[in-house]
Amino acid sequence: MVQAPSVYVCGFVERPDAPPKDACLHLDPLTVKSQLPLKKPLPLTVEHLPDAPVGSVFGLYQSRAGLFSAASITSGDFLSLLDSIYHDCDIAQSQRLPLPREPKVEALHAWLPSLSLASLHPDIPQTTADGGKLSFFDHVSICALGRRRGTTAVYGTDLAWVLKHFSDLEPSIAAQIENDANAAKRESGCPEDHPLPLTKLIAKAIDAGFLRNRVETLRQDRGVANIPAESYLKASDAPDLQKPDKALQSPPPASTDPATMLSGNAGEGATACGGSAAAGQDLISVPRNTFMTLLQTNLDNKPPRQTPLPYAAPLPPFSHQAIATAPSYGPGAGAVAPAGGYFTSPGGYYAGPAGGDPGAFLAMDAHTYHPHPHPPPAYFGLPGLFGPPPPVPPYYGSHLRADYVPAPSRSNKRKRDPEEDEEGGGLFPGEDATLYRKDIAGLSKSVNELQHTLQALRRETLSYGHTGVGYCPQQGPCYTHSGPYGFQPHQSYEVPRYVPHPPPPPTSHQAAQAQPPPPGTQAPEAHCVAESTIPEAGAAGNSGPREDTNPQQPTTEGHHRGKKLVQASASGVAQSKEPTTPKAKSVSAHLKSIFCEELLNKRVA
């Protein structure tokens, strides 16, 4: 009784266009040609296991694309095992194309998708010692992954359907394969079933799971073999074991527990990370008090934020036209204003004698429009032209917006040293305070710290206590005059110079040397220190009613500027010798009294 095979398996076992890396896998074309056609069928095994034959190879054929193999699977036990595997294997049941269901074929494509030819090693001679010859081809195995590229196996119950998947196979060879299959069907009897070594088959399946890049290599083999997509091959699909039902794809209900509830992107990020946040593996619980302590410590350790310096508005450009076209200045004289306009600030400004009334003060509305593009510069030497503009608040950036500017912190504030007696130990409760001793080094340190503190206080007093005296970067250029009624035709004046950086605050004696206002007029608030450029000879020949009686006033710009440089680079000792204003003297005297009391309390009674 002849039993037809249940499943056919065909494929290339060697491709010359994809040579293997190992030299022992190369097949000599002359040797292959001498061994064909086969004199008898070759065994078909699983994973090269000798005790696991499942069918026979009825032909090997040399084509232009490579060596082609055709075999049939006839083992009943193995076919029954394939049916059982199919019902429990998700990969075997997956299909990319709508093809008829074939449990055995689909299970074979998922488990054993490659062919492997076992041939004689090239270094071993075929001739034996007794004069016999060894068979060059030993057997063909169906396996998880072959070592030669392009050895993809195609399974099917119809031999013609299997052969049409190989587009590189010549039609003449395909016809010869069908003839040989029919001849083998007639000559073969009832196949003998051998018990399958299930333990070895499971071990080989486990080993196949650790093959590196197995799916990618199978896709490469399919491309080399030039097999179209309409087949049961699983190498074209990446494994996808997680295919939940539609009911499971709906989002879970939102949690109402405030301890585990996440909102917004936090919940989405936890889901995208594999639910680690929900599982609680990457999270730790910290008490609220501990968390607040850590947060406060982190904030305390941050460096202090640097307060930006006030933005100094650029000086308005100097215009010679305002001086050249100005009429003679005197009581009631007006000024010719350039084209344009500006708005004055509330409170008005000092404009000199207006309308013959000495000491007149012009009060302006907050929105009074004046034909000037910018507020006029303050010409202090010419009281009949313009007066000092209102103080300008510190600006940040380019927007006219006043902000609060905190005073710099006292970084060098003196700290008290721990009180220790001469033996180095502390005072216990009840001990007399007269036992307190302090060495000379400690006293020197306290004196140095107090000197630095006095210097810092003096600088702060000069910077913030006398803001109206000194250089003002927001105002216009300043001029000096020797007469009470302003500029004379034979006098010379100096074009103001722009200073890239504001000079240090002036000393108190410079502020005290400011010129008094002309008689009969109200003196405006000083905004800058005048620099005289008129020589003494010219001043003596002046026709002004008031003479300069202050011999200590600097007469040259270089002398005044040198004084500024000295002030900028003065040390603490030099500053202590300079005269100060009465307000600075009072502060210094108060600090000296505090220092004396501090020393008296620390000294030995």
From Swiss-Prot:
SUPFAM superfamilies: Herpes virus serine proteinase, assemblin
Enzyme class: hydrolase
Keyword NAD: no
Biological processes annotated in GO: nuclear capsid assembly; proteolysis; viral release from host cell
Record GO cellular component, one term: host cell cytoplasm
Region (Disordered): 235-274, 403-432, 489-588
Biased composition (Polar residues): 568-579
Pfam families: Peptidase_S21
Motif Nuclear localization signal, chain ranges: 410-416
Active site annotation, chain numbering: 48 (charge relay system), 116 (charge relay system), 139 (charge relay system)
Marked site: Cleavage: 235-236, 568-569
Family: Belongs to the herpesviridae capsid scaffolding protein family.
Name of the molecule in the record: Capsid scaffolding protein
The species this protein was found in: Epstein-Barr virus (strain B95-8) (HHV-4)
